[in-house]
Regions:
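N-terminal leader/auxiliary helical segments
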Residues: 1-84, 90-251
């Protein structure tokens, strides 16, 4: 997705669904987690790297998921956090893109639909301004990303992130140039995308948990057996997530 607010909203909602110990494992570097939520989108903003973004989006389950899984299970705090956010980016795209492509055949715009979804979320949260693209921790995160996402390079990622931040912060958001072009039909369609996104939060948490419970140090522990056999309501990490949001960035 070419804009970022929906991915950030989705990722943080998924974190709230994780048990506290798994939440801690995947959120040790929250700036990296936020950057992971942008997925390969920073690479969209240059003709030199858009083909890499397209490949990473299209083939993420076959080409990227093994490296992401390894990072989630054995990587540093930065690698784990970025990988967690990145997986959630792709899961949300898998949820909404098929519907977006169908509407594109009927005349809607992919870009405008995503802007409409972001604007809808801002309106529902009563936010007057769109949050800026986050760049905290970009250097360490770029190195971690390059280590797990071939053929992505750290320099290309940083360059793309700069373009994404510059263009999004200038042109996107309430009252900005790109927002004015959203059509009435696309605003209605954005509500359906929002509903699809909300419905995917719990399944995405389960998908991420399936990867995390295979952490080697926990592989044969009672904790894993509990997670694998648990039924009913899952422990939530809302308080831990609130604490993480107040913590300074990891260095």
């Amino acid at each position: 997705m070419a804009d970022h607010n929906a991915h950030t909203y989705f990722g943080l909602r998924v974190l709230e669904q994780l048990p506290a110990d798994l939440l801690t494992h995947v959120s040790g570097d929250m700036p990296a987690f936020h950057l992971g939520l942008y997925g390969p989108d920073p690479l969209i903003f240059s003709l030199l790297t858009k083909h890499i973004s397209d490949r990473l989006h299209k083939n993420w389950r076959t080409e990227s998921l093994p490296g992401l899984t390894k990072a989630l299970q054995k990587g540093s705090a930065t690698a784990r956090s970025f990988a967690g956010g990145y997986v959630l980016h792709q899961l949300l795209d898998d949820t909404v893109h098929p519907q977006i492509y169908q509407w594109m055949e009927e005349g809607s715009s992919h870009f405008r639909l995503e802007i409409a979804l972001d604007l809808l979320l801002l309106e529902e949260k009563r936010q007057a301004n769109s949050p800026k693209v986050r760049t905290e921790g970009k250097d360490r995160t770029a190195l971690a990303a390059a280590g797990m996402l071939a053929p992505l390079g750290a320099r290309a990622y940083l360059s793309g992130l700069w373009r994404m931040a510059t263009l999004s912060n200038v042109f996107c958001g309430p009252g900005r140039p790109m927002s004015a072009g959203v059509r009435a039909k696309e605003k209605v369609q954005a509500k359906e995308l929002r509903d699809r996104m909300e419905a995917q939060i719990a399944p995405a948490a389960r998908d991420l948990e399936k990867i995390l419970v295979q952490i080697p140090s926990q592989a044969d522990s009672p904790r894993q057996e509990l997670l694998l056999s648990r039924t009913g309501r899952r422990p939530a990490g809302q308080q831990r997530l609130a604490d993480l949001r107040r913590m300074p960035a990891a260095e």
